[in-house]
Curated annotation (Swiss-Prot):
Protein name as it appears in the record: Serine--tRNA ligase
Residues the record lists as binding ATP: 262-264, 349-352
Keyword annotations: Aminoacyl-tRNA synthetase, ATP-binding, Cytoplasm, Ligase, Nucleotide-binding, Protein biosynthesis
Domain comment as written in the entry: Consists of two distinct domains, a catalytic core and a N-terminal extension that is involved in tRNA binding.
Role played: Catalyzes the attachment of serine to tRNA(Ser). Is also able to aminoacylate tRNA(Sec) with serine, to form the misacylated tRNA L-seryl-tRNA(Sec), which will be further converted into selenocysteinyl-tRNA(Sec).
Biological process annotations from GO: selenocysteine biosynthetic process; seryl-tRNA aminoacylation
Reactions mediated catalytically: tRNA(Ser) + L-serine + ATP = L-seryl-tRNA(Ser) + AMP + diphosphate + H(+); tRNA(Sec) + L-serine + ATP = L-seryl-tRNA(Sec) + AMP + diphosphate + H(+)
Pfam name, any one: Seryl_tRNA_N
InterPro entries membership: aa-tRNA-synt_IIb, aa-tRNA-synth_II, aa-tRNA-synth_II/BPL/LPL, Ser-tRNA-ligase_type_1, Ser-tRNA-synth_1_N, SerRS_1_N_sf, SerRS_core, tRNA-bd_arm
EC numbers for this chain: 6.1.1.11
Any GO MF annotation of the entry: serine-tRNA ligase activity
Transmembrane segments: none
Known partners and oligomeric status: Homodimer. The tRNA molecule binds across the dimer.
Amino acid sequence: MHDIRAIRENPEAFDRDLERRGLAPLSAELIALDDARKGAVSAAQAAQERRNALSKEIGAAKKAKDEARATELMAEVARLKEEAPGLEAAQGEAAKALDERLAAIPNRPKDDVPPGADEHGNVEYRRFDSSRERLAQGRQHFELGEATGLMDFEAAAKLSGSRFVVLKGQLARLERALGQFMLDLHTGEHGYTEVVPPVLVREEAMFGTAQLPKFRDDQFAAGENFWLIPTAEVPLTNLVRESILAEDELPLRFTALTPCFRAEAGAAGRDTRGMLRQHQFNKVELVSITAPEKSAEEHERMLACAEAVLQKLDLTYRVMTLCTGDMGFASQKTYDIEVWVPGQQTYREISSCSVCGEFQARRMNARYRAKEGRGVGFVHTLNGSGVAVGRALIAVMENYQNPDGSVTIPSALQPYMGGLTRIEGPKN
């Protein structure tokens, strides 16, 4: 959510940032809506002030025994009372029109975000190469999984339709191991507090993190006012909703392993086989709440925490700084981590780490009280995948596959697998 006062103070800068996002200028429209809101407020206030003044005049007229004047004034008061509901309604409608327009506008990109229209404008930030020899070519994860009978898309389709999977046996255990490994890393080494949040949230929570109203069609609704979370970012960030934190409490760092649900699982016809794009998947999420001057530093820290997962798994990856045309609606700046998948001979996104500034905090009314009497301001919010568990499973399967169809278990995961060192391939 944007600050209309900041827009009024520097409309040219606001429009320049929208232009970087590929949008037309909107400051004039927003200022006109705000003028209408102010006009409605002024009209309601003027009517109330007039009623207050008339009440005093009526008292004076009665004291002077001027009944005619008192009757005339009371008639005007009655008229103003009749008009009051309409003035209040106009005030509410004007405020709603402004708020709805502001809520539909994406966040302003930071100055150092590279320009670009789509993913082709993204810029490599850094990379990490595995100590293991890169496979020149390999089987895709679904070929490996289906051959063992431990990855069953046909059974999932009978249960739920397309873009679901049933994992069995050691593959199910491997996915569970990945999630537990990530949680232990983030809580034990990175200072995050583990949270087990609801996966059903109210509409206000989805609005707070900006999934609603713009991305309503991409979500799963459940009942009159419940939504299945598309990411644990929603409940974790909303933990500070409608609160005022002490600056000494910051930063807050939360992590959670949850199922995530997305009605729109990706572009039509893309990644139709396998686990890359699903309606339901597990993900470890990282969320930080900081003071404004600390958010840029926290963004780099969060990125490093997500990278540590892949480094300990010894997986090749690269970090991309997303351009203005590819970053998310609520983001000021985003880093994507893309892991190498030999089956496709390409990099695929496995984590996205974003700093949102006060954009979400304004929608949630999440504030903090600064030290030394510097007043109350909005916190900054950050979120990142730490990482997507299903995609980590894909990366492990494809990068650790063997010619016989077996999969070697990375050493970091073996303690979570009861000492198992490999998942056997299909028996001939």
